[in-house]
Amino acid sequence: MGQKVNPIGLRLGINRNWESRWFPTKANLVENIGEDYKIRAFLKRKLYYAGISQILVERTAKKLRVTVVAARPGIIIGKKGSDVDNLRKELQDLISKDVNINIKEERKAGASAQLAAESVATQLEKRIAFRRAMKKVIQGAQKAGAKGIKVSVSGRLGGAEMARTEWYLEGRVPLHTLRAKIDYGFAEARTTYGNIGVKVWIFKGEVLHKGMQPEKTEESAPAKKSRRTRRGK
């Protein structure tokens, strides 16, 4: 189960919170879901180069607040906040409602799975070797303090005739452990040979309740490193 399902959705209510935080009625449920989709699609397209790791949408009875967590917030804010004001106006025109925007900095960009996946996808589009791109992201996550990372790329890698999947694993990524705090990201690289899917899982440690003790592991054991290739049919 843990190998197939989205690890963020599996852990909602355990050690992850929802990214859309509001309580709907039957009358506005469909409208709110549609607005959330439009907001996220617009911001990801408009602010792609700002390195967005998370978009939170919060609603009250009269207010709608959007929080954007980005690795390069200066690109969004602009000089004296002028770009944020323009962005707010565009969002208000998009959904015909008043919107408050908060910009937060992603302090550990290397430990963000979404940013890591987008980084690999960008490098693949620039025709950088996929193994080199994967190793670079793994090194960045380790420097940021990640306890484990798995990177998977799928498609016509290197322009090969047959599609295949390759992945690297460093450290531990316990997908079946619900108390494990695992971040997940997905991106697509649009190359001349077709689309290449990129998936990244990052293990940041275990979230323990009071009275619980972490599992004992051998500190002297070297980090696990493996690579597996699966050819497409």
From Swiss-Prot:
Keyword match Cell division: no
Superkingdom of origin organism: Bacteria
Listed Basic and acidic residues bias regions: 212-222
Residues covered by the KH type-2 domain: 39-107
Single GO term (MF): mRNA binding
Transmembrane regions: none
Gene3D superfamilies: 3.30.300.20, Ribosomal protein S3, C-terminal domain
GO biological process: translation
Database matches in HAMAP family: Ribosomal_uS3_B
Record's subunit section: Part of the 30S ribosomal subunit. Forms a tight complex with proteins S10 and S14.
Protein name: Small ribosomal subunit protein uS3
Species, as recorded: Campylobacter jejuni subsp. doylei (strain ATCC BAA-1458 / RM4099 / 269.97)
